[in-house]
């Protein structure tokens, strides 16, 4: 089980979230956000953004080291082989990704496994799984994921959370304005991308999230 303190302000990003910058500058930006007080970090890199595999590994290891120095869990999105190779703190899987049982077998009992859920059927199935925490969404429209499902909104989120017994974070299009409403629901925190990557002062936003959850 994942300590719920780690789920309050769960930050997700990769170099592609700073597409206007070089990989090296994007890494610097991500580290600044890590230093703002986020509680967990999920490394999520999408698209052909690296010159070669060595550049990817250099990027991953630098971000992992920064997270370790800050005592922040370093979670790898989707890539189970990478998570095993660098001994990440865990892996986050989507519904179409590797089976949780396989991830557990390869990672061992002490690593974190997260699972994305989008509807009641997936949420109910996840209750019986070995996932340490769930990410439920998208709650609102989001531009951070090109393949995101249709957002289901706050009303359906409340209904879905009634059947949940696991540690869980809300994700998808979360803004400063929606934080107050979400904090009144049985969520352990929020997972955010653009709310922090586009922020001029991420520390203020992180502080607000910690005050609410």
Where are these predicted regions, by residue range?
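Active-site phosphate/pyrophosphate-handling residues
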Residues: 81, 155, 191
